[in-house]
Amino acid sequence: MDFHSLLAVSPIDGRYAAKTASLRQYFSEFALIRNRVRVEVEYFITLCEIPLPQLADFGEGTGMSRDELFTRLRQLYQSMTPEDAQKVKDIEKITNHDVKAVEYFIKENFKALGISRWQEFVHFGLTSQDINNTSQPLMLKEALENEYIPALKEVISILSADVEAWKDVPMLARTHGQPATPTRLGKEFQVFVSRLEEQLRQFGQLTWPAKFGGATGNMNAHKVAFPDIDW
């Protein structure tokens, strides 16, 4: 929906919208819907690859190979448009449940692809938070890797050049706010470079846990339905 920036609730989408526009692909409601579709699709594909007995023949009689169908399913999120996301929102008006709307959206596309006989394994055994608790870490991870870290590296590069340019520039240092011994401007900027490099190193060590556990966190439905699979 188009709106005047002065009507935005938050400065993020108002005053600073031009500066934060690249984050919309990660943190907008559209992005959340797209990643929910992504998690649901990849989960279904994984069930096919195990395979569950009922999915061993997935794709037979459709005129397409399994890999071709997997590609078509992945296009649901890889090529998703705001218009597609609006379809999910329209379904939500009926379901009154945002994740269930995603499930129904995917099932509608199963019908369009001629694979509706396998559609009941979409969201099999899961609860909504399994989808949310996987989608949201993906959003954070990709925003950090694709937006924040490149920007941080650019800042470090600029400051490092300043450190080199100013390495012999003397300046007065202070202790307790009082003039003290001299230092060099380049060295003082190197302090900030070192701090940012340490933060960059720590970002590189981050892990991104997700959670699949079913309704009560014990994979109960999975175990009852398929007891021979190590869930």
Residue ranges of model-derived segments:
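A helix-coil-helix interface module used to build multimeric assemblies
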Residues: 2-222, 226-231
